[in-house]
A protein has these predicted regions:
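Secretory targeting signals
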Residues: 1-6, 34
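Carbohydrate-active catalytic/glycan-binding domains of CAZyme proteins
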Residues: 4-21, 40-319
Length: 319
C-alpha cells in the first residue's frame, strides 16, 4: 500500500526526550543518572550495533522546557577550542513547537552528567532583527580556520539561519543561508547539518530536509563560505524508499566506513543508512542502523542522530 502522507507534527511525534546510545562494547552504565542499557539493536552489516544507555537530560528538572519536547541534539567537543568552556563537551538542543529556543547543556564527559546552561535559551525566537514563531534544530559546526562555532538552526520551517560564537554561548547572528525560495515547489527547508566536503578542500556541505508536495526528502547544499553563498540543487536528494514510512529527515554525514554514507531517520520510526558517495551522486538504501523499540523510552521512534567518538567508542545522541 502507498504510505499515508505524514504531517511535520506526525513526523516529530514522540520527540519528547533526548536519548543516548553507544556502540556494542562501550561502557554499559547510566547516562546522566538514568537506568542501565537495554539489549542492543541489529545494524547494517559493516556498521556498529548500538545499545541504549539512557537520557542525558531530565526534562522534569530543566529550568527552560516550555513544550516538554526536546529535539535535534548536536554534541561537540569544545575543550581547547572555545573561550572559557563550561565543560569539555557542549550539547545544543531545542524544543520544537512555539516558542522553541536554542538551548545548551555541558558536561566533562560525553556520558554525563549533563548540566543545563542557566541562561537558556541562548537563541530565542525574537532576536537580532527577526521575529518568528519558533527557532529549533540546532547544528553546531566548529571551524578551525577562525576558531568559532557556527550554529545552524531553522525558524520558520521555510528558513535556515546561522549564527557564530567564540565561546559557544554568546552568539552573533549572521543571516539566513537557505530558504524555500531556492527550491521551487518545496515548502520546508530545515533540519540542516553542516560538515566539510569529504574530498574538496574549502568546500562545505549541508544536508537538510525539504518538503516537496508532502513527501519529505533530504537535499544537498554546498558553499565556499560557511555563512553565505549556499547553493541547493533540486536533483541531488535522498527520497524515502520502501519500508521507510514515506518520509525522511534529520540527516547526518557518516565519515566512517570510507565515508560517503548518510544516516537519517524515517517515517518508519527507525534510523536508516544510505550510500550517497563522496560526490553525493548515488542513492543506495542499505537498511536500518538503529531499530527503535516499541516500548519506553523510544516508543517506536528514534530520530535526528548525532555521533561522537571517544576512546574508540562511538556514541549516538538522538531524539
Amino acid at each position: 500500500p502507498v504510505p499515508r502522507p505524514l504531517t511535520r507534527r506526525a513526523l516529530l511525534r514522540g520527540a519528547v526526550v533526548l536519548g543516548a546510545a553507544t556502540a556494542t562494547g562501550a561502557l554499559a552504565g547510566p547516562v546522566g543518572g538514568v537506568a542501565a542499557p537495554a539489549p542492543a539493536h541489529a545494524a547494517v552489516p559493516g556498521f556498529p550495533t548500538f545499545r541504549y544507555l539512557g537520557q542525558p537530560l531530565d526534562r522534569s528538572a530543566l529550568r527552560y522546557n516550555p513544550t516538554h519536547a526536546l529535539i535535534f541534539p548536536s554534541v561537540r567537543y569544545v575543550a581547547g577550542r572555545v573561550e572559557d568552556p563550561l565543560g569539555r563537551w557542549y550539547m545544543y538542543y531545542a524544543p520544537h513547537d512555539a516558542p522553541g529556543g536554542i538551548c545548551l547543556a555541558y558536561a566533562d564527559s560525553v556520558t554525563g552528567p549533563w548540566r543545563e546552561h542557566p541562561a537558556n535559551p541562548i537563541i530565542p525566537r525574537t532576536w537580532a532583527g527577526f521575529d518568528v514563531s519558533h527557532v529549533s534544530s540546532p547544528d553546531a559546526f566548529w571551524n578551525p580556520a577562525d576558531r568559532r562555532i557556527y550554529l545552524f538552526f531553522h525558524g520558520e520551517n521555510h528558513t535556515t539561519r546561522v549564527a557564530s560564537s567564540a565561546d559557544g554561548r554568546s552568539f552573533t547572528y549572521h543571516n539566513r543561508v537557505v530558504g524555500t525560495y531556492m527550491l521551487p515547489g518545496v515548502s520546508e527547508t530545515s533540519y540542516a547539518r553542516v560538515f566539510p566536503h569529504p574530498t574538496q578542500s574549502g568546500v562545505y556541505v549541508m544536508l537538510l530536509m525539504g518538503n516537496p508536495g508532502g513527501t519529505r526528502k533530504i537535499y544537498v547544499g554546498w558553499t565556499h563560505s560557511v555563512t553565505s553563498g549556499w547553493q541547493l540543487q533540486p536533483e541531488l536528494h535522498l527520497a524515502p524508499a520502501a519500508g521507510e514510512g514515506g518520509q525522511v529527515s534529520g540527516a547526518h554525514y557518516w565519515s566512517r566506513n570510507g565515508g560517503g554514507h548518510v544516516v537519517y531517520h524515517a517515517g518508519s520510526g527507525n534510523i536508516h543508512v544510505a550510500r550517497v558517495g563522496t560526490g553525493f551522486d548515488r542513492e543506495d538504501h542499505l537498511g536500518v542502523l538503529y531499530d527503535s523499540g516499541s516500548a519506553a523510552p523510544d516508543h517506536g521512534r528514534a530520530a535526528a542522530p548525532s555521533f561522537v567518538e571517544v576512546d574508540g567508542r562511538l556514541h549516538m545522541f538522538y531524539e
